[in-house]
């Protein structure tokens, strides 16, 4: 039986990123594979005709490459942390229907997937929690979820495409709260400069009738700007298109490599890594 998704629902906002990850898997098979996305979409009853039509456009194909690189980069950081903290908590902040935690499973870590209650309700149906895994309904801005994470073996948190929708003050409060609660832990997430965030936010800000884009989280020089928030933070960043992969794959055109360089350098598209006291 297929799970029906209606237009203009919260569920729809979760399906479209899944479709992007499936598109990545088809377009760039040497760079990225998300079998979960492919499998889940087979279980869903939804009209993908518009998404399929758009998938042929140049910018949609580049957007799929962006999604692929972002997911790969975050997974690389999670696996890197698990090398020195094999029993750590692996925490997906704003998980949607993303399965990165399970993809990074080393057989010993504890996996937590956090999102709003309506999102987790859908996730429980399509991606029920496995062994050593919990799906936790919460509001990320409310620190009550901190107590649900067993960080006795360390903790690595990651957020994909999440903080663009937070005010700068909200990100700062969350980061400082996490530094208190999870010393020795690491948070990794994608970010971009003000110009890029304005482009990302154009559609949803108009819908939400929000005028002050400048209050939303954006960063150009992460070590300097975020490092000033709290002396306990150890902040580094790498370009998210080319910082982890040179993209010299036959599936990626020279023009897309040019756009990737422009994204990393001009838009400051980056993966930010924050260590909370202790060693990174």
Walk through the language-model features, giving the residues of each.
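Rossmann-like AdoMet
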Residues: 1-91, 95-138, 151-152
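A conserved beta-strand element that flanks and buttresses the S-adenosyl-L-methionine
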Residues: 157-158
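Short alpha-helix
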Residues: 213-240
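Conserved catalytic loop of SAM-dependent methyltransferase domains
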Residues: 232-258
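Short, glycine-/aromatic-enriched active-site segment of Class I SAM-dependent methyltransferases
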Residues: 198-213
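Conserved beta-strand signature within the Rossmann-like core of class I S-adenosyl-L-methionine
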Residues: 178-194
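Short amphipathic alpha-helix with an adjacent loop that forms part of the alpha/beta core around
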Residues: 143-152
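A short, conserved alpha-helix within the catalytic core of class I
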Residues: 165-180
């Amino acid at each position: 039986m297929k799970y029906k998704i209606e237009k203009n629902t919260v569920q729809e906002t979760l399906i479209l990123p899944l479709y992007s990850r499936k598109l990545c898997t088809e377009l760039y098979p040497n760079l990225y594979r998300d079998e979960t996305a492919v499998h889940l979409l087979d279980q869903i009853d939804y009209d993908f005709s518009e998404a399929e039509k758009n998938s042929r456009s140049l910018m949609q194909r580049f957007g799929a490459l962006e999604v692929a690189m972002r997911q790969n980069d975050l997974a690389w950081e999670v696996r890197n942390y698990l090398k020195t903290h094999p029993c750590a908590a692996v925490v997906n902040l704003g998980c949607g229907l993303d399965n990165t935690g399970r993809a990074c499973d080393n057989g010993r870590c504890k996996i937590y997937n956090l999102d709003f209650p309506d999102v987790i309700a859908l996730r429980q149906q399509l991606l029920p929690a496995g062994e050593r895994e919990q799906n936790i309904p919460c509001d990320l801005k409310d620190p009550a979820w901190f107590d649900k994470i067993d960080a006795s073996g360390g903790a690595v948190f990651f957020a994909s495409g999440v903080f663009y929708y937070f005010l700068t003050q909200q990100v700062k409060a969350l980061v400082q709260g996490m530094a208190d609660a999870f010393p020795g832990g690491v948070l990794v997430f994608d970010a971009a400069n003000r110009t890029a965030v304005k482009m990302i936010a154009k559609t949803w800000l108009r819908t939400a009738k929000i005028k002050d884009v400048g209050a939303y989280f954006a960063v150009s020089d992460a070590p300097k700007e975020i490092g000033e928030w709290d002396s306990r933070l150890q902040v580094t960043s790498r370009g998210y298109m080319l910082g982890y992969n040179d993209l010299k794959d036959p599936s990626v055109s020279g023009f897309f490599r040019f756009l990737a360089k422009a994204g990393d350098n001009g838009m400051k598209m980056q993966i930010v890594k924050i260590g909370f006291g202790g060693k990174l």
